[in-house]
Amino acid sequence: TLTRAFVRAANRPEMAVLDTRKTTPGWRALEKAAVVCGGGVNHRMGLYDAVMIKDNHLALWGGGSIAKAVQTARMRFPDLKIEVEVDTLDQLREVLMAQPDWVLLDNMEPERLRQAVEMCRGGCRTEASGGITLSTIEAVAATGVDAVSVGALTHSAVAIDLGLDVGI
């Protein structure tokens, strides 16, 4: 399966290969079950299992800094994990002061990912995301990230070509 190919290509068993919420309407449970069968991990089933703060949320929020957004989310949803998307090391520095549970490192090259992982060591967990393919996942995994998320596991997986010939 596509998920199994990503898990093998990562060549780092302790790192989670995560799916995303990008699923076919009405097929989410089956597509996510297929990811697990292939050795991947379901990241989130819906918007209800974690707080993910992304760039669009911050643009619309208008409440100040990224760190303030994390603090507000933690006060409003104390039982949920908080994950923040960053795409620069400067954003990461600011976010780390608010102590999120996870940071999503979006569209970062392996060297930048390595630096980000080092900055997060002993603090929050790290997830690499954005444009990760079968040919790039091993280099991304080698940076030491805790997880890699791949939307293609659910939105672009190709069905197996099955056929059945019946002879009478």
Question: Model-found features: residue ranges?
Answer:
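Short acidic, glycine/proline-enriched helix-loop-strand junctions
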Residues: 122-125, 167-168
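Cys/His-rich Zn2+-binding cysteine-cluster or related metal-binding knuckle/ribbon modules and their
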Residues: 134
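Short, charged, intrinsically disordered terminal tails
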Residues: 152-168
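Acidic/glycine-rich phosphate/pyrophosphate-binding loops and surrounding catalytic core
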Residues: 1-87, 91-98, 102, 111-119, ...
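Short secondary-structure boundary segments
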Residues: 107, 130, 152-153
